[in-house]
Amino acid sequence: MDSDDDNMEEVVEGPLDEDDQPHGFCTVTYSSSDRFEGHFVHGEKNGKGKFFFFDGSTLEGFYVDDALQGQGVYTYEDGGALHGFYVDGELNGPAQEFNSDGQLVFRGRYKDNIRYGMCWVYYPDGACVVGEVNEEGEMTGKAVAYVYPDGRTALYGSFVDGELIEARLATLTTQENGRPHFTVDPDSPIYCYDKSTSSCIAGHKLLPDPYESQRVYVGQSLISGAGEGLFAQTEAEANTVMAFYNGVRITHTEVDSRDWSMNGNTISLDEDTVIDVPAPFNMTENYCGSLGHKANHSFSPNCKYDQYVHPRFGQIKCIRTIRAVEKDEELTVAYGYDHEPSGKSGPEAPEWYTKQFLEFQQRESGKGADETC
């Protein structure tokens, strides 16, 4: 995060001293295409200055005797930023990192440019991993915890580079000076990394997720003909993760080539992968590791699908509220099928969806007519 300007040709714009060295506010462009703008004293950076690196990243702070000292901000080429404490040009001390959306993604310390001690790594979905990093700055050890978005429910145990190996259910009880304290349930089952494949939905199919189990349950849907549905076990505010959507991982081509009757529990994860909960795993007696596939469709949903990095299942999707929900309220999402056959704005709609959409339009038209009258 610094420019190695030794033995480099440079072009100086600004005042020079009697030895033709930068002296005062100058702009120095190096042969590497890196550029520095700031204050110099007889050829050495002294005072406020900023590096503009060839890859689009920048480094800004206060220089003393040619080295960055104290608070500095390194901005990545994608707009993310690292705010840290520098000693003689190297990160040594507390630091925070933010992604390009301004969300906190790291909180902890650095030593000689490497993450050090107790560190927190945050995911955009609201969860985090916390623990003492190893000598390489990796979240590896036997006393690391994954903390769910509620900030309390946790899996505490062994991780390698932030990935779950095995852990027990725990509760984050207190924090003191950035150091968490957990109470581990000695009777908890062991949770392990259990990412699905194209043929295996999970190794431990009947092991419920502890966070999800506190928030939802499956019951008879209030929607006519929908079968089972997903319900809130407790009140929840808007933007709350309620359930997870894990399944086997198949391709879009496979989904598109088969009959619609086989696609009742499919959801697109990304441009390459579709998550599917096929029979018999659509029944909770055969699979209950995640329950997100039980959420039914509504044109007036109270939830949405969102990306989620799960400690057991890896990159999946979750069910997240878009408004406050009451205890025992059915959780619904918009499936996002294409309403127009020629539109191709989303997956082609099955017959039941098209029928429900027409009925919804008729109801909305009726409401509009009543309001006009």
Swiss-Prot record:
List residue numbers at the site (Histone H3K4 binding).
245, 256, 266, 317, 335
Q: Where in the cell is it found?
A: Nucleus; Chromosome
Q: What is its EC number?
A: 2.1.1.364
Which GO BP terms sit in this record?
heart morphogenesis; heterochromatin organization; peptidyl-lysine dimethylation; peptidyl-lysine monomethylation; positive regulation of DNA-templated transcription
Keywords, A to Z, come to: Activator, Chromatin regulator, Chromosome, Methyltransferase, Nucleus, Repeat, S-adenosyl-L-methionine, Transcription, Transcription regulation, Transferase
Q: Does Transcription count among this protein's keywords?
A: yes
Record-level GO cellular component terms: chromosome; nucleus
**Domain of life per record:** Eukaryota
Q: Name one GO molecular function term.
A: histone methyltransferase activity
Q: Which residues cross the membrane?
A: none
Give positions of region: Disordered: 1-20
Q: Which reaction does it catalyse?
A: L-lysyl(4)-[histone H3] + S-adenosyl-L-methionine = N(6)-methyl-L-lysyl(4)-[histone H3] + S-adenosyl-L-homocysteine + H(+); L-lysyl-[protein] + S-adenosyl-L-methionine = N(6)-methyl-L-lysyl-[protein] + S-adenosyl-L-homocysteine + H(+)
Q: In the UniProt entry, what is the domain comment?
A: The SET domain is necessary but not sufficient for histone methyltransferase activity.
Family, as annotated: Belongs to the class V-like SAM-binding methyltransferase superfamily. Histone-lysine methyltransferase family. SET7 subfamily.
Q: What does this protein do?
A: Histone methyltransferase that specifically monomethylates 'Lys-4' of histone H3. H3 'Lys-4' methylation represents a specific tag for epigenetic transcriptional activation. Plays a central role in the transcriptional activation of genes. Also has methyltransferase activity toward non-histone proteins.
Q: What is this protein called?
A: Histone-lysine N-methyltransferase SETD7
| Encoding gene (name) | setd7
